[in-house]
């Protein structure tokens, strides 16, 4: 089974933490590859995999667009239509309903909560 990882973890810099040294792997957003780093053994963040295979399974380059789309705040856009939509709120860590105006905005919009959760959780 694939490891369940917060999809946004792949886009933060690795954090070594303050404790003892352990060899780990992190996903480098710039190179879209998994790289070795020395982890302190405590604290740190979720961009931290015990093996290169675990890192690769959690942070595939093809997930970049979807993950970055979910980081943007849902935008209503300048038009005046009344279209209830769902967007992912990365601060709350959940999908929220908002009113889309029908034009512009961004790609963080889904017709159902289920579609939003499937893309962004």
UniProtKB/Swiss-Prot annotation:
It comes from the Eukaryota. Residues 10-59, 61-111 form the BPTI/Kunitz inhibitor domain. One of its GO terms (biological process) is envenomation resulting in negative regulation of voltage-gated potassium channel activity in another organism. Gene3D superfamilies: Pancreatic trypsin inhibitor Kunitz domain. Keywords: Disulfide bond, Glycoprotein, Protease inhibitor, Repeat, Secreted, Serine protease inhibitor. Disulfide bonds join 10-59, 19-42, 34-55, 70-120, 79-103, 95-116. GO terms for cellular component: extracellular space. This is Kunitz-type serine protease inhibitor A. It comes from Rhipicephalus microplus (Cattle tick). The lineage of its organism: Eukaryota, Metazoa, Ecdysozoa, Arthropoda, Chelicerata.
């Amino acid at each position: 089974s694939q490891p369940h990882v917060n999809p946004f973890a792949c886009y933060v810099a690795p954090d070594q933490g303050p404790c003892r040294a352990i060899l780990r792997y992190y996903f480098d957003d710039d190179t879209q590859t998994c790289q070795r780093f020395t982890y302190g053994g405590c604290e740190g963040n979720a961009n931290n995999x015990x093996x290169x295979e675990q890192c690769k399974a959690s942070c595939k380059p093809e997930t970049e667009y979807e993950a970055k789309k979910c980081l943007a705040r849902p935008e209503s856009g300048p038009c005046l239509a009344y279209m209830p939509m769902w967007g992912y709120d990365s601060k709350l860590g959940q999908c929220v309903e908002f009113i889309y105006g029908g034009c512009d905005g961004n790609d963080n919009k889904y017709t159902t909560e289920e579609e939003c959760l499937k893309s962004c959780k």
